[in-house]
C-alpha cells in the first residue's frame, strides 16, 4: 500500500532538485529559516500539483470557469491526493462580508428564520404561530381576522440580496457630506476660493450665482451672517441669470444657471462617480456614518420584523457565537410539535459549523461583525473551519503558518483540528515555526541551510525525537529546549518612563471596554492577549489613528476620548500586507538601490560612448529594457482552456534587459565588471561585496543585510515576498535616521520567522530604539514577549470575556499576575 507522496527533482523557486518522500495520513511539519524554500515545497509543489491534477479530472468546460495553477517545475510527483491550501494571509474581505457570511453560519440562520419564524398580522397585529404552511409555500392565515401573511424566503433575509436596507444598500453605513470640510479655511472670502467643493469639483460658476442669491463673496467666510452661510451650505436650487467672466480665455457672457449649494455639489459629484479616481476627488468631503434607517444592521424593515424564540434576525446576529449557539439549541423545543423534526435538521447544520469555530477559539465574535475588522489570525481560522467542516477523507491539507494570531493558550484548538483531520483519513502538511505546533508533527522536513540561493535543500527529516538529536538540524535545539533567543538589554523598572509617555483614553468599541493606556516612549512595548481580547482594536483601530489624527491636526476617531503624545511627529504602521501588485516592483526599486545603480552605469565610459543616460537603464521605461517582454522578464502565453502560462522571456532570459545593456559594464570591488542584468541577478550579500566602492548603494544594501534580507536577489518581485520579508523591507527606508519623534507599530512581525530570524528581528527593534524611536508590537511569540521592556496584556478571555487591560508592566511583573493568561507562558 502506498504510504507516502514521492517528489523527485523539485525546482520551484529556490529548490535545488529536491527529492523527498512525504508521509500520507500523518501530520508533516515543514520547518526552516525564512526564505529556505518551505512554502516552495509545501505550496509550490504539493498543493500546486494536488489541486492541478484534481482540476484536470474535470471537463474542459468546467475548468474554464476556475482559477487554475500552472504545472509545477518538478520531474515527478507521485501519489499526491487532491489538495486544499490555507494561505498565510487570507485576503481582507470587502464591506459586504461579515463573520456570518464568511463562515456561512448566516445561511443556516436565514433558513431558520424563513421557515420557523412568527409573523405579525398586518391587520390586527396578532403574532401568528410558526406553521408548516411556510415550507409548503402557502400563506399564513390569521385565526382572528382571517388576513393572510406571506412568509419571507431565506433570500429575503439576506442583506446582500432582497433583504438589504434600501438606504444603505445592505452595507449598514452611509456616506454623508461632512460640513466641516466644505470650508477648510474660513479666513478666505468666497471669491478667494473659501468653498472647497466649488473650487475642486469644477463649479466655479457657483460663486457668481451665490452672489446673485444675496451672499457677500468679498468678505471673509467667518464674517458672513448665519443666513448667508446657510445659503452657501443648504440654499435652494433656484435658477439665476448671471454675467460671467472667464479669467483663462478673458471672455465674458451671460447665461441662466441653477444654484448648487456646497452640500449638493458634493452629493451630485458622488452620484456621478464611476471610478476610483473620481471617488478620490469627492471622498475628502465625506464622512462615513451608521445608516439612520437600519441602525447598522444592514437589513430592511421587513427582514427585521419576524421573530424566532422572541428575537429578530438582527438581534440574533448581535449575539456572540457562544450565546447564539446556546440560543439555537433551544429553538426546536420552542416550536409546535409538528415543526420540531424540520427545526432539528436546520439547527443541526448550524451547530456542526459553529462547533468547529468554537473549538478554534472564535466564540467571542458576533455574526454581524464586519470581516474587514477581523485580525489575520481570526480570518485564517474562519478559512480553516470552512475547509475542514465537511469530514471528507483522502484530502491533503496544506496549512501555511496556521499559528498566526494564535496565543499559546489557543493553539490547543488548532492541534485538535489537525488530529481530527488525520483521524478522518486525511494528510496534513504544515509550514510553521512555532515549536509548540511543530512538536505535534509525526514527521518533520527541515529546509535550509540558509535562505535564498543558499537554501532549497532538505537538511534534516525524521520524527521529532530524531530531529532533536540531529546535529545538522537548526530547529532541533529549539524543539529540545536546549536553545533560546538571546535577550536584548532590559531597561530597569524605575527608568521605564524616563523618556516620557504616550497616554490614550477610549470609550467602548467592538468587544473592548473603555480603556486608559500608558506606553513608555523610547522603549519596546509588546501588546499581548488571547485571540479576540482586543489587541487589534486597541492598537490598530484606536492608538494608530488617534496618533495620526494628532500629528495631522484632524479630529480624533469617535471612540477615542483623548491622546497625549508630546513631541511625536510621525506614526508608522509596519504590517505584513504585500508590497506592490505587479512584477515591475522589485527589491532593488523598493529599496531605492536601482536609481543609484542607474546613475553609476550612466557615468561609465561604455555608457558615454553609446550616449546612454541614467533613464535608459530603467527596465520599466528605458531604451535598454528588453523589447520582447517590455522589461518584465516573463511573457504570458494565452493557451485556450488552460491557465495562462508565464515563461521566462526567450530573448532576455528573465533579466529584463536587452542585449545592448550587456555591453555596458560597471567595475566592481571584486574585480569582475558586471552589467545591470548581472547585478539584478545577485543577492543582497553578493551585491554588497560587488558595490563596496559605491557609498550610497553600499549603505542601502547594508541596511537590507542587517534586516536579515541578505538572501533576497535585487531583481526579486516584491509581491512574491512572504509577510515577514515584506515587513522588514518596508523598514529599510526608516533605518539609520534619528527617530526620537517616531512611533513604529508592528502587527505580528514574527510571521514566517524561524527562531534564528527572531533574533535578527529583536536586533532591528533595538536599533530603532537606539535611534530614539518608540516601538509597539502586537505579538504572540514568546521570545519577543520575554524580550519586551513593557508588556500590555489584554484579556482575560476573548470577546465579551476580554476587552480590558489585565496586566501592564515588565515581563516579570506580568508573569506574577495571577489574572494574566500570557503570564503563565512567559
Each language-model region and where it sits:
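Conserved phosphate-binding elements of NTP-dependent enzyme cores
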Residues: 1-826
Amino acid at each position: 500500500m502506498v504510504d507516502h507522496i514521492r517528489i523527485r527533482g523539485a525546482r520551484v523557486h529556490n529548490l535545488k532538485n529536491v527529492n523527498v518522500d512525504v508521509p500520507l495520513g500523518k501530520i508533516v511539519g515543514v520547518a526552516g529559516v525564512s526564505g529556505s524554500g518551505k512554502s516552495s515545497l509545501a505550496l509550490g509543489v504539493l498543493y500546486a500539483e494536488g489541486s492541478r491534477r484534481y482540476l484536470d479530472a474535470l471537463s474542459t468546460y468546467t475548468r474554464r470557469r476556475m482559477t487554475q495553477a500552472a504545472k509545477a517545475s518538478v520531474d515527478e510527483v507521485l501519489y499526491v491526493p487532491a489538495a486544499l491550501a490555507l494561505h498565510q494571509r487570507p485576503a481582507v474581505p470587502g464591506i459586504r462580508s461579515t463573520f456570518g457570511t464568511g463562515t456561512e453560519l448566516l445561511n443556516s440562520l436565514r433558513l431558520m428564520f424563513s421557515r420557523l419564524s412568527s409573523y405579525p398580522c398586518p391587520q390586527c397585529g396578532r403574532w401568528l404561530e410558526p406553521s408548516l404552511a411556510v415550507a409548503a409555500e402557502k400563506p399564513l392565515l390569521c385565526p382572528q381576522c382571517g388576513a393572510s401573511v406571506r412568509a419571507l424566503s431565506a433570500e429575503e433575509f439576506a442583506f446582500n440580496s432582497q433583504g438589504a436596507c434600501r438606504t444603505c444598500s445592505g452595507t449598514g453605513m452611509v456616506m454623508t457630506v461632512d460640513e466641516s470640510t466644505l470650508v477648510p479655511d474660513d479666513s478666505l472670502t468666497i471669491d478667494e476660493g473659501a468653498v472647497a467643493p466649488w473650487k475642486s469639483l469644477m463649479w466655479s460658476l457657483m460663486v457668481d450665482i451665490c452672489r446673485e442669491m444675496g451672499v457677500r463673496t468679498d468678505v471673509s467666510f467667518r464674517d458672513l451672517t448665519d443666513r448667508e452661510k446657510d445659503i452657501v451650505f443648504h440654499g435652494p436650487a433656484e435658477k439665476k441669470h448671471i454675467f460671467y467672466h472667464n479669467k483663462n480665455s478673458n471672455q465674458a457672457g451671460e447665461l441662466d444657471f441653477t444654484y448648487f449649494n456646497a452640500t449638493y455639489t458634493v452629493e451630485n459629484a458622488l452620484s456621478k462617480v464611476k471610478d476610483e479616481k473620481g471617488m478620490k476627488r469627492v471622498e475628502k468631503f465625506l464622512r462615513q456614518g451608521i445608516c439612520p434607517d437600519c441602525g447598522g444592521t444592514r437589513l430592511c424593515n421587513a427582514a427585521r420584523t419576524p421573530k424566532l424564540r422572541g428575537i429578530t434576525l438582527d438581534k440574533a446576529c448581535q449575539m456572540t457565537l457562544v450565546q447564539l449557539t446556546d440560543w439555537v439549541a433551544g429553538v426546536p423545543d420552542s416550536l409546535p410539535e409538528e415543526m420540531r423534526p424540520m427545526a432539528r435538521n436546520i439547527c443541526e447544520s448550524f451547530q456542526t459549523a459553529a462547533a468547529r469555530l468554537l473549538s478554534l477559539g472564535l466564540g467571542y465574535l458576533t455574526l454581524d461583525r464586519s470581516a474587514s475588522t477581523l485580525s489575520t489570525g481570526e480570518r485564517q481560522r474562519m478559512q480553516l473551519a470552512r475547509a475542514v467542516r465537511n469530514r471528507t477523507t483522502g484530502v491533503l491539507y496544506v496549512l501555511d503558518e496556521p499559528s498566526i494570531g494564535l496565543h499559546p493558550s489557543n493553539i490547543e484548538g488548532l492541534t485538535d483540528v489537525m488530529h481530527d483531520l488525520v483521524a478522518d483519513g486525511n494528510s496534513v502538511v504544515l509550514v510553521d515555526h512555532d515549536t509548540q505546533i511543530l512538536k505535534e508533527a509525526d514527521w518533520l522536513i527541515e529546509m535550509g541551510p540558509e535562505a535564498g540561493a543558499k537554501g532549497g535543500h532538505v537538511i534534516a527529516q525524521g520524527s521529532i525525537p530524531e530531529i532533536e538529536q540531529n546535529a545538522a538540524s537548526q530547529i532541533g535545539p529549539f524543539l529540545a529546549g536546549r536553545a533560546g533567543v538571546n535577550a536584548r538589554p532590559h531597561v530597569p523598572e524605575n527608568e521605564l518612563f524616563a523618556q516620557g509617555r504616550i497616554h490614550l483614553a477610549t470609550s467602548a468599541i467592538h468587544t473592548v471596554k473603555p480603556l486608559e493606556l500608558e506606553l513608555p516612549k523610547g522603549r519596546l512595548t509588546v501588546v499581548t492577549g488571547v485571540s479576540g481580547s482586543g489587541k487589534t482594536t486597541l492598537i490598530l483601530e484606536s492608538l494608530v489613528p488617534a496618533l495620526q489624527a494628532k500629528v495631522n491636526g484632524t479630529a480624533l476617531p469617535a471612540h477615542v476620548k483623548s491622546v497625549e503624545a508630546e513631541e511625536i511627529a510621525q506614526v508608522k504602521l509596519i504590517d505584513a500586507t504585500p508590497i506592490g501588485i505587479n512584477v515591475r516592483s522589485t527589491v532593488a526599486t523598493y529599496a531605492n538601490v536601482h536609481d543609484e545603480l542607474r546613475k553609476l552605469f550612466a557615468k561609465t565610459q561604455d555608457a558615454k560612448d553609446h550616449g546612454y543616460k541614467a533613464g535608459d537603464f530603467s527596465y520599466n521605461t528605458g531604451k535598454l529594457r528588453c523589447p520582447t517582454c517590455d522589461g518584465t522578464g516573463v511573457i504570458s502565453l494565452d493557451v485556450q482552456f488552460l491557465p495562462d502560462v508565464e515563461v521566462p522571456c526567450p530573448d532576455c532570459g528573465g533579466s529584463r534587459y536587452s542585449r545592448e545593456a550587456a555591453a555596458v559594464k560597471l567595475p566592481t570591488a571584486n574585480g569582475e565588471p558586471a552589467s545591470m542584468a548581472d547585478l539584478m541577478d545577485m543577492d543582497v550579500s553578493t551585491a554588497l561585496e560587488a558595490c563596496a566602492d559605491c557609498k550610497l548603494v553600499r549603505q542601502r544594501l547594508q541596511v537590507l543585510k542587517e534586516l536579515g534580507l541578505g538572501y533576497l536577489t535585487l531583481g526579486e518581485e516584491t509581491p512574491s515576498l512572504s509577510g515577514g520579508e515584506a515587513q522588514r523591507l518596508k523598514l529599510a527606508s526608516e533605518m539609520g535616521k534619528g527617530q526620537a519623534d517616531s512611533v513604529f507599530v508592528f502587527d505580528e512581525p514574527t510571521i514566517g520567522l524561524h527562531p534564528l530570524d527572531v533574533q535578527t528581528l529583536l536586533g532591528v527593534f533595538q536599533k530603532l530604539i537606539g535611534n530614539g524611536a518608540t516601538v509597539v508590537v502586537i505579538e504572540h511569540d514568546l521570545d519577543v514577549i520575554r524580550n519586551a521592556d513593557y508588556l500590555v496584556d489584554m484579556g482575560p478571555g476573548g470577546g465579551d470575556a476580554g476587552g480590558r487591560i489585565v496586566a501592564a508592566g515588565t515581563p516579570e511583573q506580568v508573569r506574577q499576575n495571577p489574572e494574566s493568561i500570557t503570564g503563565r507562558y512567559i
